């Protein structure tokens, strides 16, 4: 038993022990009293009590000890029975105990230094450290931000957190406004800035998903991501076709990964292979160029992963195989655009290095056209997997630089496979995901039954305002009810007039749905796990220490994308280089 438990137990039973010791003297007084009748004994005790208490120490006579034990145990039993049968009152909380949080409630969760926090509201922040002084105050850094159009999701929450500059950042940027306004802030704080632009490919760095394929497991992940985000709208048809496409794409990508030169491992080569896969319905023996490649592979590597997958695909008859090829071609149609082929020819984003040094990756997408948004989803899927693997394999489970994913317009980028599992596991690797939505129903529409799991792993949830009914209903229920006093009057007039007053207690929502719908534009509601909700002011961007470096403050600070992409790398005298002789490399 620990000292703390022993002290608590002693404090609980000390009064009964003291009573038992004192009453041993009463037992002695009773024993010394003369008389056979009860009345005589009691009268005689008037003289023996002073004698018994003349000695301050308790009596050790067996009968006296028995009296003490009975008195102490009797009092303990009486207290127990009274407590068991006592009425349970919660004065002032009869219909609910909901209330708004205070500065004292949030204080244990905030770091003393402003820059070491996530900005939640004007008055509430959350420390970046995963190991606070008191472990019970540890919270994950995942944040769910919900707010209707014009509620200030970007200005009042996303941009202030980006300006904190304490982590690496991956920012979903509709219309590229965040990059233009905050890009120079990142550069002046020593960040490497990387850009993937799906609106204007000419103002983008190159991104090649094949560059991050290092194993057969990675091949399956890439195929899953590609198919999940290029399946189009509406209900799916026969799953046979999707499974067949998966077989073919897996086989082709595996072949490129294991057999093709690095410069040919891209979507352009994948499309070229598909375009040469002619099928003759009336000639089952016909072999197209890709068939010949896999036939040669089977001779060289009989048990290759690519060969096994392709063999399964070839079980399809000619007409069926043709339909599979058409489906694959339609799925990869966006890559027929030359600009997109050029964009995915090689890789400059270096997604696996975001946890090594401070980096800001801006993923620019259109908020009106979702044609190329699947690329953004592919980036996030590969990013999470790469960083988790690197944290486990290289850094012992935790990245040296925290990586924050600020996913604005989360509903528009498509589905990130296994997001419900990722948000539950990335915390320990120093990765966090912040989802920004216009309504909770958007998450439900994309992730179905997994939406609740995703929300459940967001320790911080912020409502900036809106009128979507489901969001208002859920939020009102989560805020709970408070107990209020009701004052009623009655006034009866007539031949026998009367007047009366009455008081009663009622339960009332902390904020009802109609009150949430008309929430002040400068207010927001913060819910932090394990803490009372906060009704606070939104953070004022102009008060941030780095605000003067943004283009909001001075248009001269506008980030020039073209100038940045066309810059030449400067070689510093202290840079180290590794020289490799190509002729000395072993042949494939």
Model regions and ranges:
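Basic- and hydrophobic-enriched, low-structure N-terminal and domain-boundary segments
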Residues: 1-151, 155-158, 202, 481, ...
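A residue-identity detector for tryptophan
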Residues: 13-16, 30, 100, 157, ...
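P-loop NTPase motor domains
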Residues: 21-28, 134-431, 446, 514-538, ...
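Short alpha-helical interface patches
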Residues: 49-55, 63-118, 216-226, 272-276, ...
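General secondary-structure edge motif
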Residues: 98-100, 125, 141-142, 308, ...
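Conserved long hydrophobic alpha-helices within structured protein cores
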Residues: 113-120, 374-382, 475
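Low-complexity, polar-biased intrinsically disordered regions enriched in Pro/Ser/Thr/Gly
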Residues: 126-132, 231-240, 262, 485-504
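Conserved ATP-driven motor cores of ASCE-family P-loop NTPases powering translocation/secretion/packaging/pilus
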Residues: 423-525
């Amino acid at each position: 038993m620990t000292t703390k438990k022993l002290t608590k137990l002693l404090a609980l039973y000390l009064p009964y022990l003291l009573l038992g010791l004192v009453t041993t003297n009463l037992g002695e007084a009773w024993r010394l009293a003369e008389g056979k009748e009860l009345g005589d004994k009691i009268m005689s005790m008037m003289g023996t009590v002073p004698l018994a208490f003349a000695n301050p120490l308790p009596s050790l006579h067996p009968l006296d000890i028995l009296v003490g034990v009975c008195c102490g145990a009797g009092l303990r039993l009486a207290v127990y029975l009274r407590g068991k049968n006592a009425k349970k009152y919660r004065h002032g909380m009869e219909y609910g105990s909901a209330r708004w949080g205070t500065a004292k409630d949030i204080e244990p969760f905030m770091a003393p230094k402003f820059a070491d926090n996530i900005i939640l509201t004007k008055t509430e922040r959350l420390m970046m450290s995963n190991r606070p002084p008191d472990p019970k105050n540890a919270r994950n850094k995942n944040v769910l931000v919900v707010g209707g159009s014009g509620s200030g999701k970007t200005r009042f929450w996303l941009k202030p957190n980006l300006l904190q500059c304490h982590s690496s950042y991956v920012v979903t940027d509709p219309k590229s406004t965040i990059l233009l306004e905050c890009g120079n802030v990142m550069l002046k704080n020593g960040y490497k800035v990387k850009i993937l632009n799906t609106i204007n490919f000419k103002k983008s760095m190159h991104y090649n998903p094949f560059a991050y394929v290092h194993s057969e497991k990675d091949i399956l992940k890439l195929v899953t991501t590609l198919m999940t985000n290029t399946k189009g709208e509406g209900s799916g048809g026969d799953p046979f076709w999707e499974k067949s496409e998966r077989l073919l794409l897996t086989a082709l990508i595996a072949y490129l990964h294991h057999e093709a030169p690095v410069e040919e491992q891209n979507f352009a080569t994948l499309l070229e292979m598909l375009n040469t896969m002619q099928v003759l319905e009336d000639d089952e023996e016909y072999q197209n160029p890709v068939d010949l490649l896999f036939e040669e592979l089977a001779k060289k590597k009989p048990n290759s992963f690519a060969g096994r997958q392709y063999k399964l695909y070839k079980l399809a008859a000619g007409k069926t195989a043709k339909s599979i090829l058409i489906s694959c071609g339609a799925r990869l149609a966006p890559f027929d655009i030359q600009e997109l082929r050029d964009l995915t020819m090689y890789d400059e984003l270096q997604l696996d290095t975001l946890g090594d040094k401070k980096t800001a990756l801006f993923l620019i997408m259109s908020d009106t056209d979702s044609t190329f948004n699947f690329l953004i989803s592919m980036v996030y899927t590969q990013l999470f997997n790469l960083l988790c693997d690197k944290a486990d394999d290289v850094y012992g489970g935790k990245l040296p630089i925290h990586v924050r994913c600020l996913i604005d317009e989360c509903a528009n980028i498509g589905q990130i496979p296994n997001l419900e599992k990722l948000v539950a596991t990335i915390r320990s690797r120093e990765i966090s995901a912040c989802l920004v939505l216009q309504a909770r129903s958007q998450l439900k529409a994309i992730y179905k039954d997994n939406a609740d799991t995703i929300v459940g792993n967001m320790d911080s949830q912020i409502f900036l305002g809106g009128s979507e009914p489901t969001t208002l209903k859920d939020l009102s229920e989560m805020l709970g009810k408070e107990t209020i006093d009701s004052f009623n009057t009655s006034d009866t007039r007539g031949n026998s007039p009367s007047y009366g007053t009455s008081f009663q207690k009622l339960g009332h929502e902390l904020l009802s749905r109609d009150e949430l719908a008309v929430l002040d534009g400068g207010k927001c509601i913060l819910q932090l796990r394990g803490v009372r909700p906060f009704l606070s002011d939104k953070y004022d961007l102009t008060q941030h220490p780095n605000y003067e470096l943004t283009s909001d403050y001075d248009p001269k600070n506008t980030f020039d994308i073209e100038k940045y992409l066309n810059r030449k790398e400067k070689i510093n005298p202290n840079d180290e280089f590794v020289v490799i002789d190509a002729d000395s490399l072993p042949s494939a």
